[in-house]
């Protein structure tokens, strides 16, 4: 199964594509869609077109996107919601089912700790996918979203606590201690 993860943003939208076979995760592609400094409609169109192109190029079976959180600034929340909507339209227009996860669920599934930092997310994504270099934070979050979806269902929320990722971490000489990755 191929999963496309999206980390929505008005200026930068991250994407990550992974293949899942049983418990094995394989990196396919990742990167960002950057919008031009332009009016809102142009930026949303860029996000929609970019996501639509990703769907055509990588032919994912499913997609996962981060839910919007209510920010201190309502205007920022509305803009993020619009960017997210443009990305969802690109996914749905390609015929994909779209799953949604909160940032807390994402971090819990990937790192085993719901309040993990961006650098912890990047490190875990790098290790789980055996990447030679560390992806940028937007691409790492999108790859993490795909990983989260791969581990969703009966295991979501229990991966760190019950050991869904513990064997993978142990093979890499890592473990989670007090919410932090330790070697």
Curated annotation (Swiss-Prot):
Binding site for Mg(2+) 1: 7, 138
Free-text remark on how the cofactor is bound: Binds 2 Mg(2+) ion per subunit.
Broadest EC class assigned to this enzyme: hydrolase
Enzyme Commission number(s): 3.1.21.10
Amino-acid positions noted as binding Mg(2+) 2 in the UniProt annotation, renumbered to this chain: 66
Compartments, as annotated in UniProt: Cytoplasm
Gene Ontology biological-process entries: DNA recombination; DNA repair
Cofactor(s) recorded in Swiss-Prot or TrEMBL: Mg(2+)
Primary location group: cytoplasm
Keywords attached to this entry: Cytoplasm, DNA damage, DNA recombination, DNA repair, DNA-binding, Endonuclease, Hydrolase, Magnesium, Metal-binding, Nuclease
Catalytic activity: Endonucleolytic cleavage at a junction such as a reciprocal single-stranded crossover between two homologous DNA duplexes (Holliday junction)
Molecular-function GO terms, alphabetical: crossover junction DNA endonuclease activity; DNA binding; magnesium ion binding
Highest taxon of the lineage: Bacteria
Annotated catalytic residues: 7, 66, 138
Gene Ontology CC terms, in alphabetical order: cytoplasm; Holliday junction resolvase complex
Purpose of the protein: The RuvA-RuvB-RuvC complex processes Holliday junction (HJ) DNA during genetic recombination and DNA repair. Endonuclease that resolves HJ intermediates. Cleaves cruciform DNA by making single-stranded nicks across the HJ at symmetrical positions within the homologous arms, yielding a 5'-phosphate and a 3'-hydroxyl group; requires a central core of homology in the junction. The consensus cleavage sequence is 5'-(A/T)TT(C/G)-3'. Cleavage occurs on the 3'-side of the TT dinucleotide at the point of strand exchange.
Similarity annotation: Belongs to the RuvC family.
Subunit-level organization: Homodimer which binds Holliday junction (HJ) DNA. The HJ becomes 2-fold symmetrical on binding to RuvC with unstacked arms; it has a different conformation from HJ DNA in complex with RuvA. In the full resolvosome a probable DNA-RuvA(4)-RuvB(12)-RuvC(2) complex forms which resolves the HJ.
Name recorded for this polypeptide: Crossover junction endodeoxyribonuclease RuvC
Top-level taxonomy: Bacteria, Pseudomonadati, Pseudomonadota, Betaproteobacteria, Burkholderiales
């Amino acid at each position: 199964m191929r999963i496309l993860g999206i980390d929505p943003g008005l200026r930068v939208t991250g994407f990550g594509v992974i293949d899942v076979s049983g418990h094995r995760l394989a990196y396919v592609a990742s990167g960002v869609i950057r919008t031009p400094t332009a009016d809102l409609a142009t930026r949303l169109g860029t996000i929609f077109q970019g996501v639509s192109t990703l769907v055509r190029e990588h032919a994912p079976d499913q997609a996962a996107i981060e839910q919007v959180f209510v920010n201190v600034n309502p205007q920022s929340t509305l803009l993020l919601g619009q960017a997210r909507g443009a990305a969802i339209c690109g996914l749905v227009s390609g015929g994909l089912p779209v799953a949604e996860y909160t940032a807390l669920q994402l971090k819990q599934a990937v790192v085993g700790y719901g309040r993990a930092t961006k650098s912890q997310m990047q490190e875990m994504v790098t290790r789980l996918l055996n990447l030679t270099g560390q992806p940028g934070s937007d691409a790492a979050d999108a790859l993490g979203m795909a990983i989260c979806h791969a581990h969703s269902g009966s295991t979501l929320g229990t991966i760190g606590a019950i050991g869904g990722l513990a064997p993978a971490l142990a093979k890499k000489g890592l473990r989670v201690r007090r919410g932090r990755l330790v070697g």
